[in-house]
Amino acid sequence: MYAIVKTGGKQYKVAVGDVVEVEKLEGEPGSEVTFPALLLVDGSDVTADADALAKVSVTGKLVEQTKGPKIRIHKFKNKTGYHKRQGHRQKLTRVEVTGITK
């Protein structure tokens, strides 16, 4: 059984036991998380009806808070001597999916 959940502006296809990296969620490692915005559930039959999905919830456990890979930004303007370097590492949360309840 799998479900498609939306968190952090992105959609993820998850099943029980999966570990997914999502945008940063508040909470300590080991705490419980529930994903409310559910888009699709597949079990014996596929459910995409909004009324039926309101009863479904996906729960997970926070595994750890991490950072993504370093992204380097370099702005440059020709002939003026202007250049600017900047780096960024996105904060991520690893979540282990513990249950999909219908």
Swiss-Prot record:
BP terms from Gene Ontology: translation
Keyword set, alphabetical order: Ribonucleoprotein, Ribosomal protein, RNA-binding, rRNA-binding
InterPro entries: bL21-like, bL21-like_sf, Ribosomal_bL21, Ribosomal_bL21_CS
GO molecular function, a single term: structural constituent of ribosome
SUPFAM superfamilies: L21p-like
Similarity section: Belongs to the bacterial ribosomal protein bL21 family.
Protein name: Large ribosomal subunit protein bL21
Species for this entry: Saccharopolyspora erythraea (strain ATCC 11635 / DSM 40517 / JCM 4748 / NBRC 13426 / NCIMB 8594 / NRRL 2338)
